Amino acid sequence: MRRRYSHDPPGSFRETKVFGFRGEYGCKALVDLLAGKGSQLLQVRDKMPDSPLGSQSNESRIPKHSEALLSRVGNDPELGSPSHRLASLMLVEGLTDLQLKEHDFTQVEATRGVWHPARVITLDRLFLPLSRVSIPPRVSLTIGVAGVGKTTLVRHFVHCWARGQVGKGFSRVLPLTFRDLNTYEKLSADRLIQSIFSSIGEASLVATAPDRVLLVLDGLDECKTPLEFSNTMACSDPKKEIQVDHLITNIIRGNLFPEISVWITSRPSAAGQIPGGLVDRMTEIRGLTEEEIKVCLEQMFPEEQNLLGQVLSQVQANRALYLMCTVPAFCRLTGLALGHLYRTRLAVQDIELPLPQTLCELYSWYFRMALGGEGQDKEKVSPRIKQVTQGARKMVGTLGRLAFHGLVKKKYVFYEQDMKAFGVDLALLQNTLCSCLLQREETLASSVAYCFIHLSLQEFVAATYYYSASKRAIFDLFTESGMSWPRLGFLAHFRCAAQRATQAKDGRLDVFLRFLSGLLSPRVNTLLAGSLLSQGEHQSYRDQVAEVLQGFLHPDAAVCARAINVLYCLSELRHTELACSVEEAMRSGTLAGMTSPSHRTALAYLLQMSDICSPEADFSLCLSQHVLQSLLPQLLYCQSLRLDNNQFQDPVMELLGSVLSGKDCRIRKISLAENQIGNKGAKALARSLLVNRSLITLDLRSNSIGPPGAKALADALKINRTLTSLSLQSNVIKDDGVMCVAEALVSNQTISMLQLQKNLIGLIGAQQMADALKQNRSLKALMFSSNTIGDRGAIALAEALKVNQILENLDLQSNSISDMGVTVLMRALCSNQTLSSLNLRENSISPEGAQALTQALCRNNTLKHLDLTANLLHDRGAQAIAVAVGENHSLTHLHLQWNFIQAGAARALGQALQLNRTLTTLDLQENAIGDEGASSVAGALKVNTTLIALYLQVASIGSQGAQALGEALTVNRTLEILDLRGNDVGAAGAKALANALKLNSSLRRLNLQENSLGMDGAIFVASALSENHGLHHINLQGNPIGESAARMISEAIKTNAPTCTVEI
């Protein structure tokens, strides 16, 4: 057999052998075996020891069967590799509406090329039970879009099985394709087995356990007759000849061969023919990751690194191309087309040759490659092209007619009778052009099957045929009989094609219409002029076609996939004004007024294709309920969705709940902050969380869900196992609401971030949360700030911290906690080994509480972030903290701003910094440490090698303190951020800092805002930057410089340090 595989270059075929057996007894034995008559066969074998079945052991026959399979699938070294990308599949629970109803391209585009998070199953476990109490699947179904590698997967599995790497429970694997089955009108189970084993010179099957046979049926989408399970008569007789589709239906049902395992591969849309109840296991082949795309292209250009870099750059720069390149077959086609383009650029030395921006432009380059147009000048048609133009046009015309009618009839595999019926000259099918478009394959019935290398090529060729035929046709080209109401002129036929495409429920004409539109774009006309198109003929149609397309953007309640496809068609036509205007409105924040059907459709299109919607689609302050409702079908596929501040009320949550409940839902993060959501809206969202399996982050801050809404969400958390982050900040849930949430945390083991700030939570709520923390094993961050838990609430949480060894971040800001509460918290911190961040801002911690903090910090080795801002530490408390800083070996961030700290405490902290080797951030702003305190800290900077950020805003620092800091910066090589805003360093201080900048190489940000620098001070700093190339940002605002002088200094800084951003 001559077979061409998807990863082989165009025009290449492999010689392979079809394996089988002969002998009436052997066939009967196998059929009986598969039909569930194993015991009878064993008895017959025992009575006939001289038979082939009784004379050879099973072990001796299996190697021969394996050798035959290896011969059939070839010896590609990649097959059988444990690192093969098809070594694992995704377990899925069923087909989604998107898979059942939409074109393969639409599936990839709508999901942004990101596959649904799913459980992964390795190939060696594909047919094994998932648990100890389950049974192996009898019928397995693997789905994947066109070109993703379903046949390659089958070959990979067969190769691995033949080498004993997978499927060790099977003694026989019987692979068969629907291309083979299409050659039969009727077939019995008996003849089916004979057709598989027709060429091995002995009966190679023996009586074995019947469940050790795997029948593989590859390519259900290529079956010429749809499977109709409801209208097919049951048949259990393996000798009875019935229609092939009935035979397959009865095998899947188990009426025939009930003991064997059946594995079917299919495109998603065709897989819907099989009732879900008959499928025991469904898997999906994922597309290529970014790294796998790179590897795929590297394999195409192993010795052309420059070319590889150019192709990769173009793919990564064009979002539409990148998304489709997640499909391996398309990735290879793209590589071939772009490789030819860049070679042509090099040959003609024309770097301005335009790069493809649309699919039609890409396929036009592929056609140029197929026509052999290397070295073609962009202004002229090469002699070689001229020589093949007439023959190519005729061949493409006949192939196009075949492709078009196949597309209309959902036919993707053609046989010799089909080729002859459409006037295809079989003798010419081996030329370069045809080998780039078609692949040829011999079937088991010794006939020849043809199909286009990829479905999209069939659609492109069909579009070229329709484009040419519609100029002279007087009847509807979609009508099989050729008779219809007269349609005169290209526009009438284009309108007909657009109507057919937009009315098709399965989207099978979507990409065809895109290509048909793209053939009218100026670039495509230039690329194909003289070969497939006539020069300039697009000009008279282009604007009118754009009007026709825009006429299909109806004011429907929801934007459907067909409407979005119209935007794709306009993009192919290079008529992008509508999409660009909406995209610009999104960037500028003026989207709120764009509510027309065309604007909504363009917005849905941009959700798929625009970088502005990736990784997050931000629709804050711009959506109404009506617009949101129209976008719902497309919001399903957003990874991250921000809908803040849109005045959404409870009815909108019912709509969003329906989206989150959908099987297709891919939303992982959704923010609904600052809307008007009440408890009814929260309940609607909670109902969706009961079934949703994608959402990991839900932000409901600043709404009004109250205790009833919190209870509904808490009940959902008892069942939901995907949500990891929930924000209920500012929702007035009070103690009653937090009690329900705490109860849910006892059983929920996935929530890791819970935000309950500003919810009027008191002692009772804190106690309930503390009890939950003693049992919860997942929560890592609890945001409890701006409530009223007081000391007793803090004591309850402290008791929980003695038990809980999971929580890492605890925020108790502004909770009326005094020394008593802090003291108990610190005792817990002495034994707790997981808490790394503690926020005690805006409480009432005095020097006595600071003493307890010091004792804890000297013993604790896990706390890294401690925030004591706006407490009552004074010098005595800060000095106590300084003792801990000198001894602690884990703290990295310490915030002491606004604590009435003066020079004495700053001196103690300076001494501690000379000993500390972990602190990277110290914040002392709003403390009157003065020049003396600044000098003490500066002295520490001369020896400290870990501090990165120092905040000294509004710290009463004058020129002397600035001079001390300047001296330290000439020595220090680690400090990157120095903030001196709101001090009074003056020109003298500025000069000292400027001199330091000439020598310092580590500082990246310097803030001298509001420091009375004057003109001279600003000039000192600006001049110093000519010798400093490390500073990235400097702020000189709020200094009495004057507008003209500020402009001059800004220009000077930009000249001296072009990489430095200046605010002045």
UniProtKB/Swiss-Prot annotation:
Gene3D superfamilies: P-loop containing nucleotide triphosphate hydrolases, Ribonuclease Inhibitor. InterPro entries: Leu-rich_rpt, LRR_dom_sf, NACHT_NTPase, NLR, NLRP_HD2, NOD1/2_WH, P-loop_NTPase. GO terms for biological process: canonical NF-kappaB signal transduction; negative regulation of canonical NF-kappaB signal transduction; negative regulation of cytokine production involved in inflammatory response; negative regulation of epithelial cell proliferation; negative regulation of fibroblast proliferation; negative regulation of inflammatory response; negative regulation of innate immune response; negative regulation of interferon-alpha production. ATP binds at residues 144-151. GO terms for cellular component: cytoplasm; perinuclear region of cytoplasm. Pfam families: LRR_6, NACHT, NLRC4_HD2, NOD2_WH. Keywords: ATP-binding, Cytoplasm, Leucine-rich repeat, Nucleotide-binding, Repeat. Expressed in bone marrow-derived macrophages. The keyword Repeat applies. LRR repeats lie at residues 338-362, 570-593, 632-662, 664-687, 692-715, 720-743, 748-771, 776-799, 804-827, 832-855, 860-883, 888-911, 916-939, 972-995, 1000-1022, 1028-1051. One of its GO terms (molecular function) is molecular function inhibitor activity. Disruption phenotype: No visible phenotype under basal conditions. Mutant mice show an enhanced response to lipopolysaccharide (LPS)-induced endotoxic shock. Herpes simplex virus 1-infected knockout mice exhibit enhanced innate immunity and reduced morbidity and viral load compared to wild-type animals. Mutant mice are hyper-susceptible to colitis-associated colorectal tumorigenesis. Its main location: cytoplasm. Residues 138-459 form the NACHT domain. It comes from the Eukaryota. The keyword Glycoprotein does not apply. It is found in: Cytoplasm. The leucine-rich repeat domain may reduce the interaction with TMEM173/STING. Negative regulator of the innate immune response. Attenuates signaling pathways activated by Toll-like receptors (TLRs) and the DNA sensor STING/TMEM173 in response to pathogen-associated molecular patterns, such as intracellular poly(dA:dT), but not poly(I:C), or in response to DNA virus infection, including that of Herpes simplex virus 1 (HSV1). May affect TLR4 signaling by acting at the level of TRAF6 ubiquitination, decreasing the activating 'Lys-63'-linked ubiquitination and leaving unchanged the degradative 'Lys-48'-linked ubiquitination. Belongs to the NLRP family. Directly interacts (via CARD) with TMEM173/STING; this interaction reduces TMEM173 trafficking to the perinuclear region in response to interferon stimulatory DNA. Also interacts, but to a lesser extent, with TBK1. Interacts with TRAF6; this interaction results in decreased TRAF6 'Lys-63'-linked polyubiquitination, but leaves 'Lys-48'-linked chains unchanged, promoting TRAF6 protein degradation. Interacts with PIK3R1/PIK3R2; this interaction disrupts the association between PIK3R1/PIK3R2 and the p110 catalytic subunit PIK3CA/PIK3CB/PIK3CD and reduces PIK3R1/PIK3R2 activation. This is Protein NLRC3. The gene is Nlrc3.
